[in-house]
């Protein structure tokens, strides 16, 4: 039985583990959190920091690993690609290529090189240089973000120099690699697209509207169809294929978050790792393709042509909606709209009544998974912010 090293074992990796088992792999998970839900489904757990690429490489050598699968974290993707390059394991980008898709400052450099549309930005690896740049700024707002963190961590919108100075210091403090970006603030419709690239061509695509709730830099809700997507599809697909060819990427998934302003997409960030929030469940339901199997097989360097042949146009619209509290405090009750309840195909509750929320901006209470028909879309878009209620004691 071939051995797979999967670089984490959180809730986000549970479906990956089940899929790997179904495909015949002996699964070894890593990570720092032994309590992660996914570890109990693995054949073996080896504690190892997935953000430490050298440690992951050493673990893979020690365990005589056959294939490595990145987890739903940018650090995990980088470490997986690094170890695979060193060991000659297929299915992954070169490490230096991977950095263009998982480190925000490297992405900006690639965007500039390829003339891609993205908010203007400056990037820094020294605090004093970043502060000098802030002092030279003549317009606000700006966005300050660590170059290496995902999930909205450390991102701040700043409206004056004092706010920018504080945000820059905080971003440097949070960044593991001690690099940050200061980026022009773009206001528009946030969307996301996940594509499968085969031989440098987009052969499968899935675009969503991405909404925020209380935290403007964390996706709370993602659901197709993306507004006015057909008007920008040609540009996005051409740009993805330009990136794929220029950086000679391996076959597999590529996800881009972007903002549409005045009918033009502005690319914010990219990733080639597995998505969190079990988003692949939604994509699989709508397209007829098992995205988890597609991800595992591509990470293992296997052909995916047979799976891709099952893809069909969207006939339903599935998405996830995270549940957050409106403030810090103790949860008294959680209510879900009865009509919306009838659209759910899964519910994952992490906490409930009696739980004390200490950071309502990031402390997710649970996630609702739903499927809509075309006739539901108008109702859903009108009511989506009122489909659950968290009451605090």
Give a label for each model feature.
Residues 1-95, 128, 303, 353-354, ...:
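ATP-binding N-terminal substructure of ATP-dependent carboxylate-amine bond-forming enzymes
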Residues 85-154, 159:
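A conserved helix-loop-beta module that forms one wall/lid of the active-site cleft
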Residues 113, 296-393:
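Peripheral (often C-terminal) accessory segments that flank ATP-dependent C-N-forming ligase machineries
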Residues 117-119, 141-144, 155-192, 216-222, ...:
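Conserved ATP-binding module of the ATP-grasp superfamily
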Residues 162, 184-249, 253, 260, ...:
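ATP-dependent carboxylate/phosphate-activation module, predominantly the ATP-grasp catalytic core
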Residues 181, 250-256, 306-311:
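Flexible, glycine/charged-enriched surface loops at secondary-structure junctions
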